Amino acid sequence: TAIISSLILFIIFFCSFFVELITPYNPFDPSSLSLMEAFTPPSWTEDGLSKFILGTDGQGRDMLSTILYGSRISLIVGFSAIIFSLILGVGLGLTAGYFGGKYEMFVMRLTDVQLTVPSILMALLVDGIARGLISREMHDEMAIYVLIFAIGISEWPQFARVSRAATLVEKNKDYVSASTIIGVSNLVIMFKHILPNILRPILVIGTIG
């Protein structure tokens, strides 16, 4: 099962990032528009054309090419957003769990507040703020980056809560106490000793995300 799943993921990634080798059509190229071939059915139907395997849309663009080019953007945005939220959430959760006190209380209350807001609503809110702060032309140019930030900022609380809980368990173990006694800095203890031991649940959440 794992091998089959990995093979399917490899095919998806290959087709998405090497789409130019698979199909000659670029849906973003205005010259690819052909209203005469609009709404062409898939190639296996009676009126289908062999050059359009999945048919065309209302503007005559090849549907297979549109899906593949779109999947590339979706994968880039998805992975970048998860990495951003992972770095932010783990950083806050790890430091909150390690130092504790008012800082931990502040971070956890912040996660509680944000978890009351649906992720999609938070992403739309961030995008709306971005539209108000920058010009429309700049927003169009930075649309992908704004989307990555909007999704990432809405997903970090789950990483923060898990990493904080795991850090609370790890920081009371003997290897952390030994490192503290011999004078190892807090930064080294957190990111070199504790972080590798709490990565497993974090990576599981990241994979699901």
What are these regions (language model features)?
Residues 1-90, 95, 102, 116, ...:
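Gly/Trp-centered helix-boundary motif
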Residues 2-9, 141-144, 186, 198:
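Primarily residues marking transmembrane-helix entry/exit sites
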Residues 5, 121, 147-148, 177, ...:
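Hydrophobic/aromatic positions within or immediately flanking transmembrane alpha-helices
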Residues 53, 84, 88-89, 97-103, ...:
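Generic hydrophobic transmembrane alpha-helix motif, especially the helices
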Residues 56-61, 98-99, 178-188, 192-196:
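Short helix-to-coil transition segments within interhelical loops
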Residues 72-88, 187-209:
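Transmembrane alpha-helices
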Residues 172-175:
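ABC ATPase nucleotide-binding domain helical subdomain, centered on the C-loop/LSGGQ "ABC signature"
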